[in-house]
Amino acid sequence: MAFATIDVTKGITGVTPVANGGTAISSGFKNGVDPRKNAQPLIINGDMAVAQRGTSFTSVSSGANFPVDRFEFYPTNLGTYTIIQEALTSGEAYNNGFRTALRIDTTTADASPSSTDYAYLRTKFEGQDLQLFKKGTSNAEKFTLAFWVKSNKTTTGQVNLFDIDNNRLVSGTYAISSANTWEKKVINFPADTTGAFDNNNALSLIVEFFLDGGSNWTSGTAPTAWEAQSNGDRNVNNFDLAGSTDNDWAITGVQLEVGEFSSTTIPPFQHESFDDNFYRCLRYYYDKP
């Protein structure tokens, strides 16, 4: 077997580095360099590939439910749902390398929720994994969240970053333009010079996709700058998932990046091997045979 030879000025023989006139990878990179500050994806199982608890749950109406690892769907008597790990076989998310998604279908509608009722999907972070954001310092970094989403509804949804350590919140919105079509969304959130994330293994941050809720969650104003958390601000742009049994919502390819990126500059999703993804999930849940 012949092995490639290494040249300190050219790298692998026959390949010219960028510094010597080679061609840089352009999508999400600058001068051929990945702009990420993190070596691994900050969001674990963002491609929805690992589902230790099962791949389909029916008659879901309350409590914490995990159709895939690290993503928790939590309704409180606001509609009834089927939640699944969906296998993808076509569409733009599939064309971009995603083979699984988390899908929520409304099976019993509730178009008039009680004031305290809600339904959201969330994923959580330890503070020690968030220190690159330098939150609470004068050098605080912006946040960029990206994901693929599909629904029968053409409407606007709200996603929140919820700082548990300091009880602070900031919100962003995404618009679904075409029904039943995978669309990629990129949302920027501002830096926060107030309130550092604790540097430990306790819960510090929640990324929260609010999908429905009563007036206690819709009565405020969605904050575009970090502020003290108020429940009334968390679902101002109500997606109304429970409003009809025709409604569904699916998501995959969720990534959180340090810094501000656009749809053209955001680094590619970090596809891990299934084993690497699975072992990171085991830190939080182990389904013993």
Regions found by a protein language model. Give the residues of each.
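Short, intrinsically disordered N-terminal pre-domain segments
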Residues: 1-13
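Extracellular and organelle-lumenal recognition/adhesion modules and their flexible linkers in secreted
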Residues: 28-289
